[in-house]
Amino acid sequence: MTRSCSAVGCSTRDTVLSRERGLSFHQFPTDTIQRSKWIRAVNRVDPRSKKIWIPGPGAILCSKHFQESDFESYGIRRKLKKGAVPSVSLYKIPQGVHLKGKARQKILKQPLPDNSQEVATEDHNYSLKTPLTIGAEKLAEVQQMLQVSKKRLISVKNYRMIKKRKGLRLIDALVEEKLLSEETECLLRAQFSDFKWELYNWRETDEYSAEMKQFACTLYLCSSKVYDYVRKILKLPHSSILRTWLSKCQPSPGFNSNIFSFLQRRVENGDQLYQYCSLLIKSMPLKQQLQWDPSSHSLQGFMDFGLGKLDADETPLASETVLLMAVGIFGHWRTPLGYFFVNRASGYLQAQLLRLTIGKLSDIGITVLAVTSDATAHSVQMAKALGIHIDGDDMKCTFQHPSSSSQQIAYFFDSCHLLRLIRNAFQNFQSIQFINGIAHWQHLVELVALEEQELSNMERIPSTLANLKNHVLKVNSATQLFSESVASALEYLLSLDLPPFQNCIGTIHFLRLINNLFDIFNSRNCYGKGLKGPLLPETYSKINHVLIEAKTIFVTLSDTSNNQIIKGKQKLGFLGFLLNAESLKWLYQNYVFPKVMPFPYLLTYKFSHDHLELFLKMLRQVLVTSSSPTCMAFQKAYYNLETRYKFQDEVFLSKVSIFDISIARRKDLALWTVQRQYGVSVTKTVFHEEGICQDWSHCSLSEALLDLSDHRRNLICYAGYVANKLSALLTCEDCITALYASDLKASKIGSLLFVKKKNGLHFPSESLCRVINICERVVRTHSRMAIFELVSKQRELYLQQKILCELSGHINLFVDVNKHLFDGEVCAINHFVKLLKDIIICFLNIRAKNVAQNPLKHHSERTDMKTLSRKHWSSVQDYKCSSFANTSSKFRHLLSNDGYPFK
């Protein structure tokens, strides 16, 4: 039932039309003192008891009776301040008596006496004596009559439109007007062919049946233009009502009302970390299959927009799910908002879902600053449907807020996806011309071909590398193609005057530019340096210089035939970065630069898809399948994941590092992909019988008193195996570098590693050897304890904890990784801890399979190293890391890809 304002003389009703006009409605407070103040301000008496009027549970007051200073704003949403009391005169804004027909004419003809009492309506009781001017009441009546006449005129016009199509159903009428696409027409005819729309009362939304709600939401999501057309005929509800209908508490498609309720409580409690967010949207493929769900006693696999399955025989099955996630601009919160089962995640459908989501977040007081999507064909269609212009000549990076005409929202394409598009274009063109030179793909091929190149065989060796003749070049295959490391390596090879790299100046400049762009849109913490730091007024000029340079170069890019790339078929990667640059400038000018805004800085990774990819990665772990899941499997996995990681008064949290997700997403953009595509062979390490001499002065006295030739050699074998195995699995460039010897400053230039090699053995780093030595010492210490009577898994977890405890006292391990710790988010679980854990797990697995046959202990006979090597290598090939889930809370994190978080 529609409620009316309880103030005397006010006929404002709580309808969609009233809320569209900016009015809000407020219930009487529950606090006794505050409630009594409101009652006295209303100034009403009960007509029967002649006593003061007591409001019921449904009594409300409209915002007309409050001062503007009584409200406080949360984004677009307004809320009454605590202690606010209605003070605006009830008759300051004239309101007429709600009468019709002859009664209306009579009251206009008869003048009111000067001391008349107010006439009560059906919705109001008698009040205390209050003066009311005759002119004000007549004016209100005339205004109301004009509004009613205007509404009747529009209604008559709309119904005449239907009468012109006498004999046609609604869908036929829409087809005749050419408002429906073929896909939408087929969907509506299949699901609503027998829908008797003319028999329903469409004016009262409270009386809508489930089928009416489903029809309205389906029509809106398919086309807002069609919805607006039909709304004139059937009086369909405003989109704000649809947002409410699509909210669900149970684990089914639609918006998660529990999440929105939690966010609303945080906003209303004044938590500023929840006032601004970015919105991420992504589609995930599903397997088209119908399955019987015993729990719901229904078939699963149909399309579902949140109001029930579209289960007609001719309706296509769901093939994709669209997910939406909010990421806090401040703080470290991120939470999935809901999902929808669709047959095809078209750009227009995703645009409609975005509008509903933005409006729903606005209703609870959260302001959406930006939207991020993939750089796909459907995403481009979605951007255009929102009002984004991607063309270089007329670029528009913002679109209008669906609930506020005065607010704009920025649009971003995911930077990682843009890198992949640029990589494909670079490899396809082979050569890209621009004003600073020519970038050649062949230079990257020549770089990876230097793998295992001995420095002693090189014609020219710089004086700085004169003592590295027994070293070999090892290309760090985890290095990103577009990185400063590759650019520095090419720059160094250019200085050596090597023939394959004599014309690589243009390639170096191109790689550095793309790397700088990615760093700008991937700033992760406020302690970052250079372009990886936050967006501040102090750093804006430097960042803006790179953005201007990128625009200047991108508009001049051309292939070998002088065809402009930015106007060709493979332009989206370059145009996407230009659009992101405009969006970043707009955000800085509107939120960071103005002193009145609460934005001290801006971290651009808040607009990255890494957050959503993290959720999907964890979702796939719950699914335990590499193929596309069915609708029922996805729904159950989503519910299990949400239940596991969403605690009371907590937003969705994760123990997996976002930084690792970012590296994993760019795995196919590393140098190893070039090695694989062009057949560059990588020499495997072969161990021989000859002894390896290395300084082990840091060993314990008990070990020093022994003949350590075999012991030393075996430990180095283990360290070498661990280094080679992890270098093939890790995707972090800095962590791989830390595995190899780096006793000289010139041991690393960009992506090139100068690794000491003797008798086929790559020397591991000193820190790695120390870790392996500590691992062996701890295992020996506990080898005769009762712990070895435990099952294998429990024994491994026990040893892992003991080794980590022993390593915690060694602060000088892998010191070269210290700067690398600030590349990701500030957190306790960083790459240093993860690297230690990976080394420990790898060592224990190798040792567990070979200790019975080749124990690491001193004996008089020399071990057959070839046999040891062969057995160790076989065990490494079969090696899979175990879970580390039960480790102490300080080092516990979720592993993936056979136990390796960086894979």
Curated annotation (Swiss-Prot):
EC number: 2.7.7.-
Purpose of the protein: Active transposase that specifically recognizes the bipartite 5'-TXXGGGX(A/T)-3' consensus motif and mediates transposition.
Note: Able to mediate mobilization of P-elements when transfected in Drosophila.
Zn finger spans (THAP-type): 1-89
Keywords, comma-separated and alphabetical: DNA integration, DNA recombination, DNA-binding, Metal-binding, Transferase, Zinc, Zinc-finger
UniProt motif HCFC1-binding motif (HBM): location: 123-126
Listed GO MF terms: DNA binding; sequence-specific DNA binding; transferase activity; transposase activity; zinc ion binding
Name of this protein: DNA transposase THAP9
Organism annotation: Homo sapiens
InterPro entries cross-referenced by the UniProt entry: THAP9-like_HTH, THAP9_C, THAP_Znf, THAP_Znf_sf, TNP-like_GBD, TNP-like_RNaseH_C, TNP-like_RNaseH_N
Domain of life: Eukaryota
Keyword check for Coiled coil: no
Keyword Metal-binding: yes
GO terms for biological process, alphabetical: DNA integration; DNA recombination; DNA transposition
